[in-house]
Amino acid sequence: MRKLGRSTTIRCIVLGVLVLAATSCSQKHSSVAEQIAKTYGLDSFGQIDAIRYTFNLQFPGLNVSRSWVWEPKTGQVSYEGKDKDGKPVKATYVRSQLSSQSDAVKNDIDPGFINDNYWLLFPFHAYWDTSANVQDKGKQELPLGNGSAELVSVKYPSDVGYAPGDTWDLYVGKDNRIEQFVYHRGGPKKPSVVIATWEGYKKAGPLLISTDHRGTADGGPLRLFFSDVAVKLTGSDTWMNAQ
């Protein structure tokens, strides 16, 4: 695994906003995003006390693996990974107290958490992030392979978050599951365009999770997948593994 800072150009390709699950009373949720999020378990998300997962990225010359436990109700994040020398690194922090954390947490670990969490739970974030502009653009041809699907575009403001102006083009099937997506970076950093599948669907408790994404980043082969996915429900100490 490379040092977090050196892998920024790949692992921070989806940092659209800074605050997880934040909503604004002055802005309305997208009905299109809500319909998709409900397919992934939105109505049951309040039952989730903790989510555990390992983010794995394979790209030419780069292999990254990061493990997380996120407690949505408290905002606590626990991280396990390695530094540039391959030595284990662990950190636990509360996101509402991020300003009091070390530079390593603020500049490397938390941006990595946001990135990985968005990959895992983007159908929810597209609904939670009321600053995003969500548009249904009708049926379009899939970017990979044959067939067509409903194109739902999620564009973030140009002045918000780690990577402002990012756009996620979601190709949604009749069952409201995302089949593929095209990511367009709003800023100058690479990669500029990521095209990937949404596959390997599993249920983790009440949540539906896509655990495997295969495609390209600026034309180079990319695989991003999740392992050790599990959830812990309110009132239980037992992890429910995705299957």
Model-identified regions with their sequence ranges:
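Flexible, processing/modification-adjacent segments and terminal tails
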Residues: 27-31, 96-166, 186-189, 242-243
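N-terminal mature ectodomain segment of secretory-pathway/periplasmic proteins
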Residues: 30-107, 136-139
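Gly/Pro-enriched, hydrophobic low-complexity segments
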Residues: 146-241
